[in-house]
Amino acid sequence: MGDKVKILAFGDVNGNFEKLFTNVERLNERAGPFEACLCVGRFFHPDGSSNDELLPYLQGRLKVAVPTYFIVGGEDANPVDGLPTDGGDLCKNLTFLGRAGCRRLPNGLKVAYLSGAYDSRKYDESAVFHRGGNSFKPFYLREDVQRVVDASKTGEEEELAGVDILMTAEWGEKFDTLLDESVPNPLEHRPVNTLSPAVTTLGASVAARYHLAGTENVHIQLPPYVNELHATRFYGLGAVGNETKVKSVVALAVTPTIQLALAAARDGVNENADATPCPYTAKPRPKPVPAEA
């Protein structure tokens, strides 16, 4: 089956860079070595305030211990001078993946990613009016989502094995379609719905073996669900340094799809007899009928 790649994944960093990189270094010493760290959700401070904690790393005075790849959510990512809007390195071992797409990391993992947040007022507008210049818009467009879908299916390898990891800031609408009492909906009583129909599209269309998302400050692993090639495991991750001590990190060991034949890639379903249908396309479970008195 090939060698597994050990990675760390964190939820929203929210500008808590010192805590993030200290945690990564500590975990790498205790349980590593890890070959990558992936960050989903809001990476920079939510209100666009100072990101001074990042400066020592950008200036080379402090080092990022593990190659770190991040996306952004709906925060203002522009306070950091020189943020490459289409992705690139901020400093050694710290890489912004970009707005939307699919790429292979040096460790062999194939990741699909979508930065930004869903805004129904902007979603169907043309990129002509929102792209260009040096500023990064905090929302994504329908064509960005389609770009991720297309990139995840381009090439013989992707057609056979899909991608290893889907990274989004948000959770998708209908993620809870098939949940029951054994896995309660952690967002059921939230006063504001922050779920994204665009992420629903990605969850249903991208054959990823893992889907990582932040934003909700919830740590949860949902039962694996069937995609068109194998099975997807969804992880919601808490924010780094959150006051309620929600777990913000998960460690994974992943065999890159490049090392898997089609039959091995499909073993994801065979190895998980409890894999559910895709929640994004499935019909809701019927509600229990109360017993008559």
Question: What do these predicted ranges mean?
Answer:
Residues 1-293:
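Extended recognition/assembly regions associated with phosphoester-bond processing machinery
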